[in-house]
Amino acid sequence: MHEMSLMESVIEIVCETARQNGATRVKSVRLDVGVLSHVNPDALIFCYEAVRHGTVADSATLEINRIAGEGWCLDCGKTVALEERFGACPDCGRHRVQMTAGDELKIRDMEVI
């Protein structure tokens, strides 16, 4: 389960950022997780519950925003929705689509006090 190491890194970044900004507690964390990122949101939530204890994020809520897959078709020049990595362009059917969204995992923001 790679979600555990991902969430350990998220908590480490959140706690370090809180410390650098003089915060004593983190109230909430919002993540952007792409639907094509191969990251399971339910597993992230489970891991979050396990790794936040004993940190400044101990009582922080977690919100996960799912980011849709999107790409730029190099053949027809359109921005298109992607349902899978390396999928075909839904307009022209060709596979020369450069992914532009949907594979990210990032901390969108956090609320501290």
UniProtKB/Swiss-Prot annotation:
Coiled-coil intervals, chain numbering: none
Gene3D superfamilies registered for this protein in UniProt: 3.30.2320.80
Keyword Ion transport attached: no
Positions annotated to bind Ni(2+): H2
GO MF: nickel cation binding; zinc ion binding
A GO biological process held by the record: protein modification process
Binding site for Zn(2+): C73, C76, C89, C92
Keywords: Metal-binding, Nickel, Zinc
InterPro entries reported for this sequence: Hydgase_Ni_incorp_HypA/HybF_CS, HypA/HybF
Role this protein plays: Involved in the maturation of [NiFe] hydrogenases. Required for nickel insertion into the metal center of the hydrogenase.
Family membership noted in the UniProt record: Belongs to the HypA/HybF family.
Protein name: Hydrogenase maturation factor HypA
Organism annotation: Rhizobium leguminosarum bv. viciae
Gene that encodes it: hypA
